[in-house]
Amino acid sequence: HPAMLATIGSAALLGIDAVPVQVEVNTGESGVPNLILVGLPDAAVKESEDRVFSALSNSGLRMPRTRTTINLAGSDLRKEGAIYDLPIALGILVATGQLICDHLTDYLIAGELSLSGATRPIKGGLAMAVLARELRRRAILLPPVAAQEAALVEGLLVYEITSLDQATRFLSGQLKLTPLTSPRGTATTVHRDHEPDFADIKGQQAVRRAVEVAVAGGHNLIMIGPPGSGKSMIAKRIPGIMPSPTLEEFLDILRIHSAAGQTMNGGLRFLQRPARAPHHTIADVGLLG
């Protein structure tokens, strides 16, 4: 086998942002047939070898029978999670000549694979889409859910990939996929049946007035009083009277939730501002991470 090199564009999550990672696959090297993974992979990334092997064979494709080196370039950056399964599998297919695609550089690709070859959800779809747009990539390939988050980013084609087989047929031109459209238009329907309501507060005229002024002007507010006087009860009801986030704020909120793996239901849960109530004894590290 002549040595062949394939490069697939992917990403790594760094906090709530994504940074570029190149998945380089080199097959046909002389030596004992085995797979070597380099580029600071963590345990989940190292295990991708076994997942990719099963996913390829269950998709009717084959692993190379030569020594193969996979490098996750951006080598000083720690790679975490199973998001490189799909780019590694596609890199192996390109390097072994099982997939011919002459416009691979147009795409940013990430996704976890199950043993059957189906894709599984990943964190940080929105951050990866923002990165793909910054890198001037034409399109991004992501598993379901992550793809729906990514569709919120304008100026980028987002394709939802459900299996390795579908990805190979799409990239080789045998299959046409329709890019996802942004779910922003559906932003009006949100059911708030169980939200605490500011109208539930009985009495407390002075506190209510202070809260309304703070919310209207975007000010900080401290409530001091004995236990049971209603501080927490009032605080829980403040999000209900805050204005809905602007589109930019909405994307910022979503980026944080996406990086934490807290996916949105159908795309638009955050028409109300998220409220967090850390305990007053919390340490700095617990609060800020």
Predicted regions and their residues:
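Peripheral, non-AAA+ core regions of ATP-driven protein-machinery
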Residues: 1-236
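Conserved protein kinase catalytic domain
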Residues: 93, 168, 239, 251-255, ...
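Short, exposed beta-strand "edge-strand" segments with a Pro/Gly-rich flavor and a Y/T-containing core
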Residues: 155-162, 238-245, 276-282
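Switch/coupling sub-region of P-loop NTPases
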Residues: 196-209, 218-220, 249, 255-289
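Walker A/P-loop
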Residues: 222-264
